[in-house]
Amino acid sequence: MTPEHLPTEQYEAQLAEKVVRLQTMMAPFAAPVPEVFRSPVSHYRMRAEFRLWHDGDDLYHIIFDQQTRSRIRVDSFPAASALINQLMTAMLEGVRNNPVLRHKLFQIDYLTTLSNQAVVSLLYHKKLDDTWREQAEALRDALRAQGLNVHLIGRATKTKIELDQDYIDERLPVGGREMIYRQVENSFTQPNAAMNIQMLEWALDVTKEATGDLLELYCGNGNFSLALARNFDRVLATEIAKPSVAAAQYNIAANHIDNVQIIRMAAEEFTQAMNGVREFNRLQGIDLQSYQCETIFVDPPRSGLDSETEKMVQAYPRILYISCNPETLCRNLETLSQTHNVTRLALFDQFPYTHHMECGVLLTRK
């Protein structure tokens, strides 16, 4: 695979290999046959980041080969959304012959939505001033005149200039409802929107018979907790990143959801609060003991759950675990399978043409 060519004819074979690999990894835990969710074979990534290479008068996007670290020129990127590909061309045309915008520009980050909105961040090794802002506003207006719904951001050391806003609002059809998700620049969002819809609908399906309340750790912008709120009496969710918490609060209001409470704290801190080890001012006014959480949802970083959180989640009758790293999932399952059975397993092909796998498991208490 090269950045400008996707081996779409090999998609079925690479997906089949992932299915076999996941089944082999999950065999020690008596997991059921995985439900397999396919990705679109192209234009599936909603975000992309490129370094910029200045070559005389020419200017182009590059990425670095992961093995050799050599530069690879990228004029088109079929893995990314059609909107990103449009913007890649339009941005370079707007910047290439503009000394103010081009000078010391070293990276461009693109974030797009299925609803055809975009935030583009330009990263510089220089101070940004009012002249830069004027030129950037002119570029933004020219892009919008081409029909591109785009917001521009300038970044430099200790500097962030938003011309309008630093977010876009995604709209996803999930289980017969349209969900609105505010996505903030430089914050985590699911990269493959089509796969995100399938993950949300799978999570809805596996919890449709759930009772009581839901606890979610690492909730981000509320991606899962807001979609799952319809299956539970109440949802209590934790997140540590301030921009994500603010986006989650907006998303709660935008989706007219009244049974979700977001707490800004780390999963490890929440474990201490639940166990009565520490008291936190952030929890004033929230009666943790009033929640009857019978399901816990975790979508941890690649490192998986730490040992204390492993112990904490074992206290819940149902554990819904989305993993971007099956190796650490299996490590966690060595502990979790002592008290719970794997009753559902899913493979989400979030990252086609790579060895990476995203998967989901539902565990129920033995």
From Swiss-Prot:
Q: State the InterPro entries in the record.
A: MeTrfase_TrmA_AS, MeTrfase_TrmA_CS, SAM-dependent_MTases_sf, TrmA_MeTrfase, U5_MeTrfase_fam
Give the residues annotated as active site: 324 (nucleophile), 358 (proton acceptor)
Looking at the UniProt record for this protein, which Gene Ontology cellular component terms does it annotate, in alphabetical order? Answer: cytosol
Q: What class of enzyme is it?
A: transferase
Q: What is its EC number?
A: 2.1.1.-, 2.1.1.35
Annotated PROSITE patterns? SAM_MT_RNA_M5U, TRMA_1, TRMA_2
What are the GO MF terms of this UniProt record?
A: rRNA binding; tRNA (uracil(54)-C5)-methyltransferase activity, S-adenosyl methionine-dependent; tRNA binding
- Name a single GO biological process: tRNA methylation
* Catalysed conversion reaction: uridine(54) in tRNA + S-adenosyl-L-methionine = 5-methyluridine(54) in tRNA + S-adenosyl-L-homocysteine + H(+); uridine(341) in tmRNA + S-adenosyl-L-methionine = 5-methyluridine(341) in tmRNA + S-adenosyl-L-homocysteine + H(+)
Query: Which SUPFAM superfamilies does the UniProt entry name for this protein?
Result: S-adenosyl-L-methionine-dependent methyltransferases (SSF53335)
Q: Which residues of the sequence carry a binding annotation for S-adenosyl-L-methionine?
A: 190, 218, 223, 239, 299
Name the domain of life.
Bacteria
Keyword annotations for this protein, in alphabetical order, are: Methyltransferase, S-adenosyl-L-methionine, Transferase, tRNA processing
Q: Which family does it belong to?
A: Belongs to the class I-like SAM-binding methyltransferase superfamily. RNA M5U methyltransferase family. TrmA subfamily.
Q: What does this protein do?
A: Dual-specificity methyltransferase that catalyzes the formation of 5-methyluridine at position 54 (m5U54) in all tRNAs, and that of position 341 (m5U341) in tmRNA (transfer-mRNA).
Q: What is this protein called?
A: tRNA/tmRNA (uracil-C(5))-methyltransferase
Species of origin reads: Klebsiella pneumoniae (strain 342)
